[in-house]
């Protein structure tokens, strides 16, 4: 069985400020003492520099811990007249290692199709960023027993456009749309069932990737349910929304992941 290091990625969405980042790093210094889990902060782009400076300033106190920086989105284009967009090259230059791709809110609110998501996936890897690819089904799709079908389609378009080996440097986040921001989480058994399907699907085209890729769960994860979810054999941590804005809750989730 592969030894996959758990990851806890905090997606602040359009929330937070420099003070939140400073508060988190103060707690990181005393609570994160080893590298048994990887922690990723994904603040709004305007705060990336603040987080980068804090990473640099706390390098010694965080010695031994794995704290990285990620972005919430990027353009599929390299450069040009795309007002308000940020390229993969810019994110890499800012110090990002990761970038969230295809979050359900981007797909739903901003019309990002699976084709666009696949292009953004490629753009991230072109500049040495590791994409955190979000996949997941809506409530009606789950009720219609189409969960696996929807997720297979979202994975297959990325494979079709980028090749199977693109997942050798990628993270997948399963985020059931009916659980995102609703306070209603999937049960540990539901999460495991879908994560196992994702791993099996990728194993069909590459057993190595299927075994080694990290798959996060995202959808109303809290300190009260994280231990049971993270304990599932195919769950490798979480993509955290609301709880990432509370430094105590987020640190609790990191600690839980370290012992999962």
Swiss-Prot record:
Q: What is its main location?
A: cytoplasm
Per the UniProt entry, what are the Gene Ontology biological process annotations, in alphabetical order? gluconeogenesis; glyceraldehyde-3-phosphate biosynthetic process; glycerol catabolic process; glycolytic process
Key words of the record: Cytoplasm, Gluconeogenesis, Glycolysis, Isomerase
Subcellular location as annotated: Cytoplasm
Q: Which HAMAP family match?
A: TIM_B (MF_00147_B)
Q: Which NCBIfam families match?
A: tim
Name assigned to this protein: Triosephosphate isomerase
Lineage start: Bacteria, Pseudomonadati, Pseudomonadota, Gammaproteobacteria, Alteromonadales
